[in-house]
């Protein structure tokens, strides 16, 4: 009567024993970068990136609507989110090994014994039946092998979550930049069409004056050249607009994406104009690709614990408890109770160097993960430095281009007045038209590039994420 209790007690002891981890104590590698930003970036003022989500960064309502659509429908993002489910399932599978299972089992067996093998020199048919609960093989994790494998699976799962956050931030940036390029093409196209109408009108007047002998062939050819220049620029802008439109449709991923994209330029500015970069240490705690790299490093560290534990004895438990009988009708009769308890001790003696090779492999993979982590930090800091430099210089460039465009427009007005009053010839007026148009185009391009650079800075700093939006995707619908 006490033996079953002994088996149950042994099982309870196994559950309460804490595994001693063989994994090395984790220490975050020192960041291979400076402790502060250099130059003007250290004094840069603006919204704090750690409290700035993308909806606050994007001030244009149309762009916010398109980004929301992309986050709900983009296929590449959906694939990344499904990878989270796979990593979560893998972690749950590995975690299940830390607790014993329990199965209900029923077996029946009939066996014929030939006469020459039986004690009575005659053939016999024996039957046995059993029903009860069975404990599948359960490893008593004394040296932390299973715990280390579970920790590694957990870190891989957490890394996949950070990768999904990085993918979302990247999608916000890609949609924003595609929309900014599209909006810039619309602005250039509107200016080009307006310029083409004006030049065609001027060309018609020159043609009439040439027929009357009041304009030269040179005036005629110069005016025609400006018309053809505007036509070529119009076709170029039409091509760029359509390419940006197609890129947006792909990113949005919705069947009605084409109808959702506006056909005219939107408001300006579209983005928050000033962002403070924070400190380098904050960047390490915020950028999802850095956090994902650290989770992968932690997983490799846990793998070393599992590899070390393989050198030590492994204890497994199996058992069952139920009733047995030679007749099915006797399974629940008095005295039919049966049980078994089978502990197994496995001690590695010779494995051809397999365990040592596995340990060397785990250590090499950890060293590789350290290098990858440090490389990710260096890449992140390079991206931030580039984005800060681009944002600052493009802001000053945009200001200069605006002044240049305004100056060219004033010069065009003066040239037109001087031409109409007969002070200057037509060539001077045409040259002022050409300069004004090119400088207006340059200002539109510079303004677009500065907005795109702000998006680059937002992404490089780790972006801001709407924590209310789930990272889980439902396979039957949208994420």
UniProtKB/Swiss-Prot annotation:
Ranges for region Disordered: 102-121
UniProt keyword annotations, A-Z: Antibiotic resistance, Cell outer membrane, Lipoprotein, Membrane, Palmitate, Signal, Transmembrane, Transmembrane beta strand
Keyword Transmembrane: yes
A GO MF label: efflux transmembrane transporter activity
Sites of N-palmitoyl cysteine lipidation: 20
Leader peptide range in chain numbering: 1-19
Lipid attachment residues per UniProt (S-diacylglycerol cysteine): 20
Protein name per UniProt: Outer membrane protein OprJ
Species: Pseudomonas aeruginosa (strain ATCC 15692 / DSM 22644 / CIP 104116 / JCM 14847 / LMG 12228 / 1C / PRS 101 / PAO1)
């Amino acid at each position: 009567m006490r033996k079953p209790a002994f088996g149950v007690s042994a099982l309870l002891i196994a559950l309460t024993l804490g595994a001693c981890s063989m994994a090395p104590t984790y220490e975050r590698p020192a960041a291979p970068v400076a402790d502060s930003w250099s130059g003007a970036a250290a004094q840069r003022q603006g919204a704090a990136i750690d409290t700035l989500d993308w909806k606050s960064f994007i001030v244009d309502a149309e762009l916010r609507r398109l980004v929301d659509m992309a986050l709900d429908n983009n296929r590449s993002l959906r694939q990344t989110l499904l990878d989270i489910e796979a990593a979560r399932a893998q972690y749950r599978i590995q975690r299940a090994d830390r607790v014993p299972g329990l199965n209900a089992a029923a077996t029946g067996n009939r066996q014929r014994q030939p006469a020459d093998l039986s004690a009575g020199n005659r053939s016999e048919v024996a039957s046995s039946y059993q029903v009860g609960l069975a404990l599948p093989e359960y490893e008593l994790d004394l040296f932390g092998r299973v715990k280390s494998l579970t920790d590694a699976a957990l870190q891989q799962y957490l890394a996949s979550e950070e990768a999904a956050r990085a993918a979302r931030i990247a999608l916000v940036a890609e949609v924003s930049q595609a929309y900014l390029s599209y909006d810039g093409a619309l602005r250039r196209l509107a200016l080009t069409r307006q310029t083409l109408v004006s030049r065609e009108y001027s060309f018609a007047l020159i043609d009439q004056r040439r027929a009357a002998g009041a304009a030269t062939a040179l005036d005629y050819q110069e005016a025609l050249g400006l018309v053809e220049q505007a036509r070529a620029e119009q076709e170029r802008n039409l091509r760029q607009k359509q390419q940006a439109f197609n890129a947006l449709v792909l990113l949005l991923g919705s069947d009605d994406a084409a109808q959702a994209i506006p056909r005219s330029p939107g408001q300006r500015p579209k983005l928050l104009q000033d962002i403070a970069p924070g400190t380098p240490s904050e960047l390490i705690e915020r950028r999802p690709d850095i956090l994902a790299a650290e989770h992968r490093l932690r997983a490799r560290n846990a793998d070393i614990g599992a590899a070390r534990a393989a050198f030590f004895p492994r204890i497994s438990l199996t058992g069952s408890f139920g009733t047995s009988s030679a007749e099915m009708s006797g399974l629940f009769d008095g005295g039919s109770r049966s049980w078994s308890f089978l502990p197994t001790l496995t001690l590695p003696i010779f494995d051809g160097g397999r365990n040592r090779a596995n340990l060397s492999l785990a250590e090499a993979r950890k060293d590789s993960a350290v290098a990858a982590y440090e490389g990710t930090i260096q890449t992140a800091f390079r991206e931030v430095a580039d984005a800060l430099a681009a944002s600052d210089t493009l802001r000053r460039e945009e200001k200069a281009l605006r002044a240049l465009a305004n100056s060219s427009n004033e010069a065009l007005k003066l040239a037109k007045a001087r031409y109409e009053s007969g002070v200057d010839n037509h060539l001077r007026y045409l040259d002022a038209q050409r300069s004004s148009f090119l400088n207006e185009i340059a200002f539109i391009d510079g303004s677009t590039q500065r907005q795109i650079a702000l998006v680059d800075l937002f992404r490089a700093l780790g972006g801001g994420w709407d924590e209310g939006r789930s990272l889980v995707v439902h396979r039957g619908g949208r994420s």
